[in-house]
From Swiss-Prot:
The active site is at residues 119, 139. It comes from the Eukaryota. This is Glyoxysomal fatty acid beta-oxidation multifunctional protein MFP-a. GO terms for molecular function: 3-hydroxyacyl-CoA dehydratase activity; 3-hydroxyacyl-CoA dehydrogenase activity; 3-hydroxybutyryl-CoA epimerase activity; delta(3)-delta(2)-enoyl-CoA isomerase activity; enoyl-CoA hydratase activity; NAD+ binding. It comes from Brassica napus (Rape). PANTHER family: (RAPE) HYPOTHETICAL PROTEIN, 3-HYDROXYACYL-COA DEHYROGENASE. Keywords: Fatty acid metabolism, Glyoxysome, Isomerase, Lipid metabolism, Lyase, Multifunctional enzyme, NAD, Oxidoreductase, Peroxisome. Pathway: Lipid metabolism; fatty acid beta-oxidation.
Length: 725
């Protein structure tokens, strides 16, 4: 977790009698405790000086503030920093000092005012913004609540319904919308921002403009009965959408107290709740994810060598299927010029059609204008040969999983592409060293493993071979960030990080079913745990062909610890293939709505007769907690192997990979963080117990056995670096 950020504020008093207080804490002027204490000191100075008539608060270098520096929460959780007394910042500083001051203050907002930054601006008596500035309260997605008065001031400025929408979704609005809502008093060009704010502040001081304390406003609040109905609806919706998280409901309680009992009581409730949520397990998990996600681009021995990413102007994609067209979509959406290559006109037309459909979907949803659609599509060109590859900076191969085909493609690429060109493969199953065997360019061969649909899913696994150069990794990390993916650098192995970690997930579920557990109870328990869907619903979604192909590679590579179930092959024999055929583990209606299928029992019985498995009375009566343990502890076990083998540099990278690649619930912090919250000793003892009862599939690996026997954290760094990176 990041160390405590130092920051400050400056004060400058002009001849006009306006004190300009500037927030300084690069890169986004986050409100660390240092900044807040400095703000208080400079405010007190401005209020005590006779030559100051009014105050303007602004941020350095074109950004107002990105919000509270949440590394402070981490320090408080670890006990390395003392928490200020409850309400000190929100009540003592922002309300009783700043908002209640005898001199008016105006916030001059440029770039962004998020979280505590927006809350600080709402405590000012007016807000002037440059066009396009982002305004929002994203705290809930970090596991905390708006704790600097946001639960009280935002409803009073924009109305209760809009305030709840902004708080619960964490979605910002732009300055122009903020102006129409009443959150912003005026939008002015950036060059005029500071002078406009100074004039506005003086106009308030001289009573030419209204002196508004937003915490006292009531004109935007609905009648009490209506407000209670709105809040009840919001609470019901929150319980449905976030059943495992307490902090959104706690936030709504603070809003409600302010509506019912007045803003002062609301501020006190907000301060109390804000102090309590810091120690929730879900908050610890979400804050861990926040920092871990930002840490994936720091790769020891790669990103600490002073290498600068080279400019990638033109990218070629080989293969216009679902994956290739999705990758092309992601690239052109970020203004990369893309060549899409196919083997014939029919396939090329289909590939370009898929890209077009992906963009048209955005137009229909109002996320893209027709003009932007045309401009974006103009970045895509089709090709049937390699002639147009002579000036590309990167190629991403996305053809079928056929090793000889891929080897031929990479041998051809070496002939046509310039020497600096990065040669990437989107393979999910084939050893990258084998793909590059026929080339002399193994230092520029790298895995760029996207997840389907590639233009939507946020993870990019960057797979390094023993030969890949650090420069190529740095380049691909930069591309990943520019196309708005979370890139994670991993080593070359079967399944890489995500598929390797999670292959025991479905196999454990199959094992349980063959030994007596109801598949629909497993799916229900796993969904309640927080996964997007259970393992059987997931098999239906991806299709049985993909499920069998994926399982086969692990059975071939790790025969000693795989569970080979015949349930899916037997279903395939009867032309069941999952959701695509409307029959899999579930039956699907015209709207693709799933319902349990009583016929599944027949396939389970047949599979038992093949494997020799028999229902186990213990496994027939598993609780939801036991289902989760027997499904996910094997995943923890495999994650430990991946970490111990050096496939990942940090355990936190595996947390991020599981969250963004498999949908592991972020509020649980990721697979390794979750495991440590349970305790390695307990996980080791359960796996040991099951391995004795049910076989090698559950046997704890040496790394887990070593740490579990001592009760040591699984995510602690390896004593000696065994990283393949």
């Amino acid at each position: 977790m990041a160390s405590r950020t130092k920051g400050t504020t400056t004060i400058e008093v002009g001849a006009d009698g306006v004190a300009v207080i500037t927030l300084i804490n690069p890169p986004v002027n986050s409100l660390s405790f240092d900044v807040l204490y400095s703000l208080k000191s400079n405010y007190e100075e401005a209020l005590s000086r006779n030559d100051v008539k009014a105050i303007v608060v602004t941020g350095a270098k074109g950004k107002f503030s990105g919000g509270f520096d949440i590394s402070g929460f981490g320090e408080i959780q670890k006990g390395t920093m003392k928490e200020p007394k409850v309400g000190y910042i929100s009540i003592d500083i922002l309300t009783d000092l700043l908002e209640a001051a005898k001199k008016p203050s105006v916030a001059a907002i440029d770039g962004l005012a998020l979280g505590g930054g927006l809350e600080l601006s709402m405590a000012c008596h007016a807000r002037i913004s440059a066009p396009g500035a982002q305004l929002g309260l994203p705290e809930l997605q970090l596991g905390v609540i708006p704790g600097f008065g946001g639960t009280q001031r935002l409803p009073r400025l924009v109305g209760l319904t809009k305030a709840l929408e902004m708080i619960l979704t964490s979605k910002p609005v732009k300055a122009e919308e903020g102006h129409s809502l009443g959150l912003i008093d005026a939008v002015v060009p950036p060059a005029e921002l500071l002078n406009a704010a100074r004039r506005w502040a003086l106009d308030i001081a001289e009573r030419r403009k209204p002196w508004v304390s937003s915490v006292l406003k009531t004109d935007k609040l609905p009648p009490l009965g209506e407000a209670r109905e709105i809040l009840k609806f919001a609470k019901d919706q929150t319980r449905r959408q976030a059943p495992n998280m307490k902090h959104p409901l706690m936030c709504l309680e603070a809003v409600e107290v302010g509506i019912v009992s007045g803003s002062r009581a609301g501020l006190e409730k907000e301060a109390q709740v804000g102090s309590e949520v810091i120690n929730l397990d879900t908050t610890k998990g979400l804050i861990h994810v926040f920092f871990s996600q930002r840490g994936t681009t720091k790769v020891p021995g790669v990103t600490d060598r002073g290498l600068v990413p080279r400019k990638i102007n033109k990218v070629a994609i080989i293969g216009g299927g679902l994956m290739g067209s999705g990758i092309a979509t992601a690239l052109i959406l970020s203004n990369y010029s893309v060549i899409l290559k196919e083997v014939n006109e029919k396939f090329l037309e289909a590939g370009i059609g898929r890209v077009k459909a992906n963009l048209q979907s955005r137009v229909k949803k109002g996320k893209m204008s027709k003009e932007k659609f045309e401009k974006t599509m103009s970045l895509l060109k089709g090709s049937l040969d390699y002639e147009s590859f002579r000036d590309v900076d990167m190629v991403i191969e996305a053809v079928i999983e056929n090793i000889s085909l891929k080897q031929q493609i990479f041998a051809d690429l070496e002939k046509y592409c310039p020497q600096h060109c990065i040669l990437a493969s989107n393979t999910s199953t084939i050893d990258l060293n084998k793909i590059g065997e026929r080339t002399k360019s193994q230092d520029r061969i790298i895995g760029a493993h996207f997840f389907s649909p590639a233009h939507v899913m946020p993870l990019l696994e960057i797979v390094r071979t023993n030969h890949t150069s650090a420069q190529v990794i740095v380049d691909l990390l930069d591309v990943g960030k520019k196309i708005r993916k979370t890139p994670v650098v991993v080593g070359n192995c079967t399944g890489f990080a995500v598929n390797r970690m999670f292959f025991p997930y479905t196999q454990a579920a199959m094992f349980l079913v063959e030994h007596g557990t109801d598949p629909y109870l497993i799916d229900k328990a796993v969904s309640k745990f927080g996964m997007p869907m259970g393992p059987f619903r997931l098999c239906d979604l991806v299709g049985f062909g993909v499920a069998i192909a994926t399982a086969t590679q692990f059975i071939e590579n790790f025969p000693e610890r795989t569970y080979k179930s015949m349930i899916i092959p037997l279903m395939q024999e009867d032309k069941r293939a999952g959701e695509a055929t409307r029959k899999g583990f579930y039956l699907y209606d015209d709207r693709r709505k799933a319902k349990p299928d009583p016929e599944i029992k027949n396939y389970i019985d047949k599979a038992r007769s093949v494997s020799g498995a028999k229902p186990d009375p213990k496994l027939e009566k598993l609780s939801e907690k036991e289902i989760i343990e027997m499904t996910f502890f094997p995943v923890v076990n495999e994650a430990c192997r991946v970490f111990a083998e050096g496939i990942a540099v940090k355990a936190a990278d595996l947390d991020i990979a599981g969250i963004f690649g498999m949908g592991f619930p972020p509020y649980r912090g990721g697979i390794m963080f979750w495991a440590d919250s349970i305790g390695s000793k307990y996980i080791y003892s359960k796996l040991e117990e099951w391995s004795k009862a049910y076989g090698e599939f559950f046997k704890p690996c040496a790394f887990l056995a070593e740490r579990g026997s001592k009760g040591a954290p699984l995510s602690a760094p390896l004593e000696q670096s065994r990283s393949r990176l």
